[in-house]
């Protein structure tokens, strides 16, 4: 599929997500990466997602993180990349085979609280072992599946740095992460798969925030990432990654 067609498809998804309440105001951003290219396309800053078109996307160099000219499509004059562009860049730099990133601000993702902090910027959150996990290719019976929740640093680059370091060192169980009190970033090999993963993720978070018994009090149990993922003990941020059963606002 041509770049033009892919950006038109992302524009359609932006309108759909805006209608669903996943991209309220001008929140969120969408991106694609063409295999073997040195950059990626991402929606510009401050745009209403129900009004996107192919010229509302900038081409960003993967290494520098800066917008560069593209021979394919000329972006709208004066368009600037969102600060959250660095989140998309982190995923593309850390994981092979990713061709689409979707960053949205769903209500349910903002309700989940893991008590992250600057000193404990990532915790692992256990997902319920329900049927929809098969959308991610997880077919085991009663699997133990965890998603990283990242502290919502004021500087988005700090969020991106945490995410990239985590993804590079540990194979993620699922194709998404949660940024606490902020939103979710979901990815896939292309827009079709990424959208499917986003729909599954939204269902899971709705399920969790609707299930009252998922609300716990008291101290969470803590495990290191290596304990959870069954790898050699390694600490990424020189602190343990706690696993929270779940708490909601």
Swiss-Prot record:
Catalyzes the dehydration of methylthioribulose-1-phosphate (MTRu-1-P) into 2,3-diketo-5-methylthiopentyl-1-phosphate (DK-MTP-1-P). Keywords: Amino-acid biosynthesis, Lyase, Metal-binding, Methionine biosynthesis, Zinc. It catalyses: 5-(methylsulfanyl)-D-ribulose 1-phosphate = 5-methylsulfanyl-2,3-dioxopentyl phosphate + H2O. Belongs to the aldolase class II family. MtnB subfamily. It holds the Pfam family Aldolase_II. GO terms for molecular function: methylthioribulose 1-phosphate dehydratase activity; zinc ion binding. Binds 1 zinc ion per subunit. Gene3D superfamilies: Class II aldolase/adducin N-terminal domain. Its cofactor is Zn(2+). Zn(2+) binds at residues 103, 105. PANTHER family: METHYLTHIORIBULOSE-1-PHOSPHATE DEHYDRATASE. The gene is mtnB. It comes from Leptospira interrogans serogroup Icterohaemorrhagiae serovar Lai (strain 56601). Its EC number is 4.2.1.109. Pathway: Amino-acid biosynthesis; L-methionine biosynthesis via salvage pathway; L-methionine from S-methyl-5-thio-alpha-D-ribose 1-phosphate: step 2/6. This is Methylthioribulose-1-phosphate dehydratase. It comes from the Bacteria. One of its GO terms (biological process) is L-methionine salvage from methylthioadenosine. InterPro entries: Aldolase_II/adducin_N, Aldolase_II/adducin_N_sf, MethylthioRu-1-P_deHdtase_MtnB. The keyword Nucleotidyltransferase does not apply. GO terms for cellular component: cytoplasm. Disulfide bonds: none annotated. Signal peptide: none annotated.
């Amino acid at each position: 599929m041509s770049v033009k067609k892919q950006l038109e498809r992302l524009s359609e998804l932006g309108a759909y997500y805006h209608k669903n309440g996943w991209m309220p105001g001008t929140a969120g951003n969408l991106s694609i990466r063409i295999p073997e290219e040195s950059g990626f396309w991402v929606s510009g800053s401050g745009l209403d997602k129900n009004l996107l078109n192919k010229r509302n996307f900038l081409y960003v160099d993967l290494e520098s993180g800066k917008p560069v000219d593209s021979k394919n499509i000329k972006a709208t004059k004066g368009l600037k990349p969102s600060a959250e562009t660095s989140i998309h860049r982190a995923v593309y730099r850390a994981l092979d085979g990713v061709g689409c990133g979707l960053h949205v601000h769903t209500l349910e993702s903002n309700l989940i609280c893991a008590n992250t902090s600057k000193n404990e910027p990532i915790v692992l959150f256990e997902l319920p072992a329900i049927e929809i996990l098969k959308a991610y290719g997880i077919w085991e019976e009663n699997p133990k599946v965890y998603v990283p929740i990242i502290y919502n640093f004021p500087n988005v680059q700090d969020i991106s740095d945490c995410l990239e370091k985590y993804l590079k060192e540990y194979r993620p169980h699922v194709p998404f992460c949660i940024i606490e009190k902020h939103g979710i970033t979901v990815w896939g090999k292309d827009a079709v798969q990424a959208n499917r993963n986003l729909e599954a993720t939204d269902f899971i978070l709705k399920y969790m925030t609707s299930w009252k018994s998922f609300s716990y009090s008291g101290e969470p149990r803590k495990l290191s990432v290596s304990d959870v993922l069954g790898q050699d003990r390694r600490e990424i941020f020189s602190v343990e990654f706690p696993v929270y059963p779940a708490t909601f606002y």
